[in-house]
């Protein structure tokens, strides 16, 4: 490595907001199953506090050694609906509290996996877990919840979509932060290190380390050096920058897995913004030549960015996974907030962008008077985009305040302007229930 590369790395960290967004330990809870919910809760607490006892300390040590900030240390677990189904309990709040107590005691930032996978219908534990979500998120500090309502192979469970529209409303009423910790997915992945949608898939090893990186500022600075150049040069520049970012993510993941004595899972190639100036995905798109995100050309710019990040990342690391794309959360990206306030970015344009990028309608505040059927219809639209395009999509939406208000979440969750919603009803559409069948191109065998 020559002196120029050393200088570039120092600049990435000190000036361009590069960091490791998260190291997330995935832990299987399948061996914690018990017919008694209190015994199951005790087993869950014991396993998490044993396996992840040193996660925070190891993360801090690696950050100090490498001089690279590791912003979050997190845990993801087996979807709790699977564990709860073995009990006769009618509420899974005790399991949520066990997760929360374990997370608090080991010092991690969040714990994900209060989750259910219902893309093709409800099993015993699924409905109970979903109905438990509002109070589970209201009565815990660090628990995150997710529900997968669709997949390319299964179609969309519209009964679950309707239920989740109602649950999001109830969750937002039950607590200030609850809805920000709840994600509704289509094509959810089993190795996602990012919250609030992380859970540990049943096909995963017993315990693994997954890493999520963050580098929008690094990409923007690289693009500043090629202003006026062709799209070919633009794509190559993003690709090379993503390579550097991912290499560091892989190094951190390998060091953490070795020191913790668990397997190394994946590096998630996502570009994750923060509310800080200089750490915005929106500003990367604007650096490509857009006056403001949301104008015509935004989707094309996002497509170039997303693809080039994947190509560079795959070259840098042979174990990539998770969501792996550009995140466009409104409240967590100062450029997105500015675009909404400037009238350039609306829900419909964000929805179009989700056909390309990672995840979907993320950290968006809408008026609290929005009917649950309208929220369900938003979920259905996002799920349809994911199911048809064979990609992960999601909705993390917060019904609070009235149009034009600013809702402050604090920390990495930022501040969201309350965005207008189409006033026309989707009630009769959502009331149908049942299943939207899988698309014809899902039949691969």
UniProtKB/Swiss-Prot annotation:
Highest taxon listed in the record's lineage: Bacteria
The record's Gene3D superfamilies line, in alphabetical order, gives: 3.20.70.20
Q: Which residues form a coiled coil?
A: none
Q: InterPro entries, from UniProt?
A: UPF0210
Q: Which residues cross the membrane?
A: none
The subunit field of the Swiss-Prot or TrEMBL record says: Homodimer.
Per the record, the similarity remark reads:
Belongs to the UPF0210 family.
Name of the molecule in the record? UPF0210 protein SZO_15840
């Amino acid at each position: 490595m020559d002196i120029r590369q050393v200088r570039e790395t120092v600049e990435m960290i000190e000036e361009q907001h590069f960091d490791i967004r998260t190291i997330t330990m995935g832990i299987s809870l399948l061996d914690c199953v018990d017919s008694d919910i209190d015994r199951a809760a005790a087993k869950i607490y014991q396993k998490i506090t044993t396996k992840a006892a040193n996660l925070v300390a190891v993360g801090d040590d690696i950050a100090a050694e490498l001089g690279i900030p590791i912003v979050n240390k997190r845990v993801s677990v087996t979807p709790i609906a699977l564990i709860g189904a073995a009990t006769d309990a009618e509420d899974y709040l005790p399991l949520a509290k066990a997760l929360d107590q374990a997370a608090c005691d080991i010092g991690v930032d969040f714990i994900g996996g209060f989750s259910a996978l219902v893309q093709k219908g409800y099993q015993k534990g699924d409905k109970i877990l979903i109905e438990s979500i509002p109070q589970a998120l209201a009565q815990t500090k660090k628990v995150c919840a997710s529900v997968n309502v669709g997949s390319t192979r299964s179609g969309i469970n519209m009964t679950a979509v309707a239920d989740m529209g109602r649950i999001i409303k109830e969750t937002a009423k039950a607590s200030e932060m609850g809805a920000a910790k709840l994600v509704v997915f289509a094509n959810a992945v089993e190795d996602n290190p990012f919250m609030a949608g992380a859970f540990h898939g049943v096909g995963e090893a017993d315990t693994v380390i997954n890493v999520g990186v963050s580098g929008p500022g690094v990409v923007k600075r690289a693009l500043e050096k090629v202003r006026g150049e062709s799209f070919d040069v633009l794509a190559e520049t993003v690709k090379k920058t993503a390579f550097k970012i991912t290499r560091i993510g892989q190094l951190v993941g390998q060091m953490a897995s070795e020191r913790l004595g668990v397997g190394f899972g994946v590096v998630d190639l996502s570009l994750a913004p923060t509310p800080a100036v200089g750490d915005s995905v929106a500003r990367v798109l604007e650096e490509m030549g857009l006056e403001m995100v949301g104008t015509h050309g935004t989707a094309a710019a996002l497509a170039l960015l997303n693809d080039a990040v994947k190509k560079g990342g795959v070259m840098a690391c042979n174990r990539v996974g998770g969501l792996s794309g550009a995140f466009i959360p409104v409240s967590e990206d100062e450029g997105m907030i500015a675009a909404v306030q400037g009238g350039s970015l609306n829900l419909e344009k964000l929805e179009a962008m989700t056909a390309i990028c990672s995840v979907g309608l993320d950290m968006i505040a809408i008026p609290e008077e929005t009917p649950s059927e309208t929220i369900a219809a938003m979920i259905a639209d996002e799920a349809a985009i994911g199911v048809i395009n064979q990609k992960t999509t999601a909705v993390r939406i917060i019904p609070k305040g009235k149009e034009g208000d600013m809702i402050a979440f604090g920390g990495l969750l930022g501040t969201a302007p309350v965005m207008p919603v189409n006033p026309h009803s989707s009630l009769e559409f959502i009331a149908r229930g049942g299943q939207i069948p899988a698309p014809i191109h899902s039949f691969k065998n």
